[in-house]
């Protein structure tokens, strides 16, 4: 997926992984009962924040990384017909290595 959006400072843009629609036994989960997703793919990264000495601090994630992030972190946005999440790099809890 190509996203032409550039986040500022230490922010990243994530394409969220959709929550399961059914249980293992085949029951359909209504939207009101679904857990908020906490996993997604990084589609854009900012240049990093500036520290107290004026040096740019690079981010620990890159475009294409699969990440787990804080449940209530970030801001949901709709851009170019896609639902995306913009969040601070400090809201990323882990990078998934598969």
UniProtKB/Swiss-Prot annotation:
Could you tell me one molecular function GO term of this UniProt entry? ATP binding
Its keywords, alphabetically, are: Chaperone, Cytoplasm
Instruction: Tell me a GO biological process for this protein.
Output: chaperone cofactor-dependent protein refolding
Q: Which SMART domains is this protein grouped with?
A: Cpn10 (SM00883)
Annotated GO CC locations: cytoplasm
Pfam annotation, one family: Cpn10
Query: Which InterPro entries does this UniProt record tie to the protein?
Result: Chaperonin_GroES, Chaperonin_GroES_sf, Chaprnonin_Cpn10_CS, GroES-like_sf
Spell out the CDD domains in the cross-references. Answer: cpn10
Q: Where in the cell is it found?
A: Cytoplasm
Family under the similarity heading: Belongs to the GroES chaperonin family.
* UniProt subunit comment: Heptamer of 7 subunits arranged in a ring. Interacts with the chaperonin GroEL.
Task: Identify the NCBIfam families for this entry.
Answer: PRK00364.1-2 (NF001527), PRK00364.1-6 (NF001530), PRK00364.2-2 (NF001531), PRK00364.2-4 (NF001533), PRK00364.2-5 (NF001534)
| Task of the protein | Together with the chaperonin GroEL, plays an essential role in assisting protein folding. The GroEL-GroES system forms a nano-cage that allows encapsulation of the non-native substrate proteins and provides a physical environment optimized to promote and accelerate protein folding. GroES binds to the apical surface of the GroEL ring, thereby capping the opening of the GroEL channel.
By what name is this protein known?
A: Co-chaperonin GroES
UniProt organism field: Clavibacter michiganensis subsp. michiganensis (strain NCPPB 382)
């Amino acid at each position: 997926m190509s996203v032409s959006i550039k986040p500022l400072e230490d922010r990243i843009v994530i394409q969220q992984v959709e929550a399961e629609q059914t249980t293992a036994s085949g029951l359909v989960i209504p939207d009101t009962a679904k857990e908020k997703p906490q996993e997604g793919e990084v589609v854009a990264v900012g240049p990093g924040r500036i520290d107290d000495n004026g040096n740019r601090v690079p981010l620990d994630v890159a475009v294409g990384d699969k990440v787990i992030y804080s449940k209530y972190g970030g801001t949901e946005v709709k851009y170019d017909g896609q639902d995306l999440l913009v969040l601070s790099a400090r809201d990323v809890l882990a990078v998934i290595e598969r």
